[in-house]
Amino acid sequence: MLNKKIADMLNEQVNKELYSAYLYLDFANYYEDEGLDGFAHWYEIQAQEERDHALMLRRYLIDNGVRVTFGEIAKPDKEYKTHMCPLEAGLEHEKYVTSLIAAIYRAAFDEKDFKTMQFLDWFVKEQGEEEKNADDLIKKMKLFGGDSKGLYMLNQELNARVYTAPANAADRSEERRVGKECRSRWSPYH
């Protein structure tokens, strides 16, 4: 069983990750309206990743005997005046999420909850990647976005992005799907 403070913080993070997915779908809607389907596609994949993060946190809580409760998900309240606005808002949001993960990590350290710290190591690394990806996209937009041909090419590049589920989440899902009673002698899950 997890420490109550850590469990509460992780449970709240589930909700924050779901909000992130909601926010990125809002960005995708904006870009669809603007005729930038590649940008929309990129943020649809971002939304899927955030949902995956929520599910990973949820599973960790459940596996540690914690009842997961969901809070309200706030409606994104932004209007985007330029194509750059969602990109900048996305970077700021990723920095915010990084600070939330860091706070949970710090609390786990203070409580000597090494198991949770190890679990969160993946999220710490992931947040570094998320911030870099958001920053790189802003740099590309500044470089190419002012020119219609450049914007078209960037849109095409973003449209080629392929969704990849986190390896540890996929492995855990497969383990649950197969189930102990269904494993054969050749199963890698012995």
Which residue stretches match the model-derived regions?
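Iron-associated oxidoreductase/ferritin-like identity signal
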Residues: 1-177
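Positively charged, low-complexity/disordered segments
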Residues: 179-190
